[in-house]
Design a protein with these regions (language model features):
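Conserved MFS/SLC helix-loop-helix module at the cytosolic interface between two early adjacent transmembrane helices
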Residues: 71-100
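C-terminal ends and interior cores of transmembrane alpha-helices
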Residues: 93-109, 332-351
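Glycine-rich segments within core transmembrane alpha-helices of 12-TM secondary carriers
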Residues: 67, 147-173, 185-191, 296, ...
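Intracellular loop-helix junctions on the cytosolic face of multi-pass helical membrane proteins
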Residues: 1-17, 142-147, 168-285, 307, ...
Length: 450
């Protein structure tokens, strides 16, 4: 009876403050991720900076990369020195100012202002991203609600991404790049006010002091120091090895996953005369390339609950759930197939435009690959990392995505030296081979965490 009552508990109102804050922030971020790649490579006459597609890819890659690195430091600051309730709205304010720098870049034709935008948005994300989740988690007295709560929060993230990327192209082509950056900034300024007033109303005292303040250890300081100085056991070393192994494969996955967006815009997309290798027309309507990003968000919204049900059913079956190694391998296999399809579409089209359904298939497969293992990284690390190095190990995952983010722009530049079909077909084959190897060695790798 008690369990039934618990499942019917309402989420605290502060949870919805945090979740909707994520929606506003992600609306702006994913819009800007698409916008910066387009704006940088568009000609001066078209309102862009007039740089190359590889410059656009690298700029977009830097935005992705540094927004994964800075939350490591932002969490450290909120843990020890500055109130998370200050960090979070300060972060959204800095992001808003960053997007205003994008507006100034469009007004002045300044590359330096785009770099300043990336810096401010990255610092702001560092103060916001992890700390808003930290506040959110502490709002719940019943910790059994956390898994479902963060699943719902993830849906709010994807809703923000979907709305932003679906609408942004109309704004960009309707009123220009500069005003579009202003729209992104206004979303963050609104988010700042939402957090300040919503936090006052519904957060109570949570987050007023750094997270580590008032948190007590069961161990005495003397015992803790003794524990920290003891060498790692053989099992702990094996588990750390397993974490690094999964992380290594995740770097390969994310480099290729983020790379997908570059040929979609600069090879297949309708935005550049030298691209346009696919037919984006439906009747008299040209499908915006930003909707490829929208497709990813929509897939996460639709297939997320379905996959969760599949994993739950699998976990309750006699065979049990797939291991993290197999889920990582499955994600890589799906992504590899997406690249093989993209290379195949290039061969099949000949001198004509490819059917848009090829692009849709690529988007669905890469999204499914993401959903198979992406949400499980921190869970895997939290489950198997030795407690004394948990913080360090949790930092490994976002650092891996930072490395991937920094790399994909350069990989896109390198692949541009070769014919499209063989270059991207080889990338797909490499990812498929990695997935097959990881799947086949699953039993051996699982001994590391048993």
């Amino acid at each position: 009876m008690e369990n039934t009552v618990k499942t019917k508990k309402k989420y605290p109102k502060g949870f919805y403050v945090c979740a909707f804050s994520f929606t506003l922030e992600r609306m702006a971020f994913y819009s800007c991720k698409w916008l910066i790649a387009l704006f940088v490579a568009k000609t001066l006459l078209e309102g862009g900076l007039g740089l190359t597609d590889t410059d656009g890819a690298k700029m977009s890659a830097n935005l992705v990369a540094f927004t994964y690195l800075t939350p490591i430091f932002g969490g450290w600051i909120a843990d020890r020195w500055v109130s998370p309730r200050i960090c979070v709205p300060l972060g959204t304010l800095l992001m808003g100012l960053g997007y205003l720098c994008g507006w100034q870049s469009a007004t002045q034709g300044s590359v330096a202002m785009i770099w300043l935008m990336i810096i401010l948005v990255s610092i702001g994300t560092g103060l916001f991203k992890g700390n808003i989740s930290g506040i959110n988690g502490r709002l719940f007295e019943d910790k059994a609600q956390l898994d479902s709560a963060f699943t719902i929060q993830y849906s709010f993230v994807n809703i923000g991404s979907f709305i932003g990327t679906t609408a942004i192209s109309f704004v960009a082509y309707g009123i220009g790049f500069g005003p579009t950056f202003i729209v992104c900034a206004l979303l963050l300024f609104l988010d700042t006010l939402w957090l300040i007033f919503g936090g006052r109303a519904y957060f109570g005292d949570i987050g007023k002091k750094p997270f580590k303040i008032n948190e007590t250890n069961i161990e005495s300081e003397k015992d803790k120091q003794k524990s920290d100085s003891e060498p790692l056991t053989k099992q702990e070393k094996h588990r750390i090895g397993a974490i690094f192994l999964v992380t290594l494969f995740s770097v390969i996955f994310w480099v290729v996953w983020y790379l997908t967006y570059m040929p979609i815009m600069y090879h297949w997309g309708p935005d550049f005369d030298y691209a346009n290798k696919a037919n984006w027309m439906i009747g008299n309507f040209t499908v915006p390339s930003a909707w490829f990003d929208s497709l990813n968000a929509l897939c996460c919204i639709i297939f997320g609950p379905i996959l969760a049900a599949v994993w739950t059913k699998r976990a309750n079956s006699p065979k049990g759930d797939l291991s993290m190694f197999k889920k990582t391998a499955l994600g890589m296999l799906l992504l590899g197939v997406a690249f093989v399809i993209m290379a195949g579409a290039e061969v099949i089209r000949g001198e004509n435009q490819a059917n848009l359904m090829w692009i849709v298939a690529v988007g669905i497969l890469m999204s499914l690959g993401e959903m198979v293992f992406s949400p499980l990284g921190n869970s895997f690390i939290s489950k198997f990392s030795p407690p004394r190095v948990l913080g360090l190990m949790l930092g490994v995952w976002p650092f891996a995505i930072f490395i991937a983010g920094k790399s994909y722009g350069y990989l896109y530049e390198y692949l541009g030296k070769y014919s499209f079909a063989p270059a991207y077909g080889i990338v797909g084959a490499i990812v498929l081979i990695c997935g097959i190897v990881l799947w086949s060695l699953d039993k051996k790798f699982n001994t590391l965490v048993e």
